[in-house]
Amino acid sequence: DLRMSRGLGDVYKRQIINRSGLNNKGLYKAIAQLRHRHDRLIIGGNIGKNTLTQPSQVAADYLKMFRNLYQYVDYFSINACCDNCADGSVSHNKAHLMNILQPLFDFRRGQNQYRPILLKISPDLPDPLIDEVTDLMLSTPLDGIVAVNGTFSRKGLETDEETLDEIGSGRLSGAPLTQRAIEVVRRIHRRSHGAYPIIGVGGLMNARDVKAMLAAGASLVQLYTGYIYEGPSLVKEICRALIDDAASEASASPAPGK
């Protein structure tokens, strides 16, 4: 159930409340599709626990998907905030995260091929906890961070509480998330001194948002809500804007020897 709406007093600030969870046809159906992948495409495996998985089995959920998808994807995004349907997620404290990550590191160590492991985090984390997650990246074989997932916050929405209650729980994505997503990426980039890749995601609705995200320290970006609203033309718009900026910078730079 995706609820699309306009809000914040501006028709251009669009958002989605995602109540569908990580709905898909399952691990083995995904593998069947990935066997026919195009070699030129870079494919990431975004994996999270099943909604009904008991706490004691969460790490086993992640490891099962990691092991089975390992030969079919180019990198992994470990979604530690994967529940869109309820106001809850995998804990982001170090002990819980390492309980998930360490078996993945151990499995990867025994493989001939290296698959980068990135941790996807929530925008609802307080800043001190974002710092702890960044420090975890610096002190473990973690390869990077994906920032951020959707938010459970409804801050700033003009929709009345009664209507929001009728819509139900779910993660909010889109324009209301832009500022916080960029703030989180900037914080991670500064704390890690730009030494690790960050995939910026959240509220990227146009080329301006993408340029701001890259300026904050993102190495790559991902699109979701903006793509739903704008379609494939958004990708063309972003690429054209980045190419134009690069051309302008090149023409403004002094020629060698001058």
Where does each model-flagged region fall?
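Glycine/Thr-rich beta-alpha phosphate-binding loop at enzyme active sites
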Residues: 83-93, 136-194, 234
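Active-site glycine- and acidic-residue-rich loops that bind
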Residues: 50-63, 90, 119-139
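Glycine-rich beta-to-alpha transition loops that act as phosphate-gripper elements at the mouths
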Residues: 46-48, 121-127, 194-208
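Active-site beta->alpha loop and helix N-cap motifs at the rims of alpha/beta catalytic domains
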Residues: 14-77, 82
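Glycine-rich phosphate-binding active-site loops on the catalytic face of alpha/beta enzymes
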Residues: 80, 146-152, 204, 210-237
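Catalytic cores of alpha/beta
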Residues: 125-138, 190, 204-221
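Single conserved hydrophobic/aromatic residue that forms the stacking wall/gate
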Residues: 1-12
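Alpha-helix-loop-beta-strand connector modules within alpha/beta enzyme cores
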Residues: 15, 24-40, 94-114, 166-196, ...
